[in-house]
């Protein structure tokens, strides 16, 4: 029997990267999935964002594990669309136990040079979008009366400053405060809330030239190899970037009975990056 057998998880940013990895990992352990992603380009983001084809591939991989999945294209900035997506998913799958507020963007820029749209979009997606996710989804867990778990994807950036990431850092640090209040408010309903704080992870959000330039401003056209050389100095263990499944395994611990009394914590998976 899987560690989340028979449970249903709502996952944002599920079309690729960590979100897809979480969906597949939980499906491997017996969960059914409600998946959402924006599936269109976000104007301020300098790398290609997820597509409809990406979300369809997540569906294919979950269904290949003989688990059910309800997938919807929705923007975490749109509370109405999120609410409809989760309502439809619960209507088809019958319950909700787990919420993974994973959707996020990265738009590196110097603090005093970024424009207002870059700042606002970051906060709208990476901070307010998480509040909208839990606002849309967690009432279903409360109504179920079985307890449950919420995991919010923060970042090592919430714990350790990096230049050119003020908006990202502000959003990810804000998630810690949101998590702690939610953990306090939801504990009587046996709903646990935690943040997870990855270091660099080898996904499309990291593996792109704007991020390479963030790590290697000394190189005119940095490559992945240039990025990895710099990233090795961030993590104390000899690895430039983790794999998405490394984060998914930590998420699985937090949402399963293995973590049944873990709430209100900042769960770091950083290869020693914060040491």
Language-model-detected regions and their locations in the chain:
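Canonical Rossmann dinucleotide-binding motif of NAD(H)/NADP(H)-dependent dehydrogenases/reductases
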Residues: 2-38
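A conserved structural motif in NAD(P)-dependent oxidoreductases
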Residues: 224, 235-247
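Residue(s) in the substrate-gating loop at a strand-loop-helix junction
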Residues: 155
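Active-site helix of classical SDR
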Residues: 134, 171, 179
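Short C-terminal tail/terminal secondary-structure segment
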Residues: 160, 233, 238-239, 251-252, ...
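Short, small/polar-rich loop/turn modules that mediate ligand/substrate recognition or access, typified
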Residues: 187, 192, 262-264
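Substrate-binding pocket helix/loop in short-chain dehydrogenase/reductase
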Residues: 110-111, 115-123, 231
């Amino acid at each position: 029997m899987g560690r989340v057998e028979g449970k249903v998880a709502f996952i944002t940013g599920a079309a690729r990267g960590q979100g897809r990895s979480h969906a597949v990992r939980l499906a491997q352990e017996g969960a059914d999935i409600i998946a959402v992603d924006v599936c269109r380009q976000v104007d301020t983001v300098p790398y290609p964002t997820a597509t409809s084809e990406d979300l369809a591939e997540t569906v294919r991989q979950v269904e290949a594990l003989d688990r059910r999945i309800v997938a919807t294209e929705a923007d975490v900035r749109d509370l109405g669309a999120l609410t409809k997506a989760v309502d439809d998913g619960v209507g088809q799958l019958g319950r909700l136990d787990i919420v993974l507020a994973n959707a996020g963007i990265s738009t590196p820029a110097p603090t005093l040079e970024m424009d207002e749209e870059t700042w606002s979009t970051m906060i709208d997606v990476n901070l307010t979008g998480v509040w909208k996710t839990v606002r849309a989804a967690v009432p279903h867990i409360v109504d179920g009366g079985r307890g449950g778990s919420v995991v919010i994807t923060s970042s090592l950036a919430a714990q350790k400053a990096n230049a050119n990431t003020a908006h990202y850092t502000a959003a990810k640090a804000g998630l810690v405060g949101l998590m702690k209040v939610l953990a306090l408010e939801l504990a009587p309903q046996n709903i646990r809330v935690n943040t997870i704080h990855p270091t660099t992870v080898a996904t499309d959000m990291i593996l792109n030239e704007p991020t390479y330039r963030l790590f290697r401003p000394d190189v005119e056209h940095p490559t992945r190899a240039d990025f990895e050389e710099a990233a090795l100095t961030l993590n104390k263990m000899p690895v430039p970037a983790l794999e998405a499944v490394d984060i998914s395994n930590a998420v699985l611990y937090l949402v399963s009975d293995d973590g049944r009394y873990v709430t209100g914590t900042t769960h770091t998976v950083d290869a020693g990056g914060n040491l």
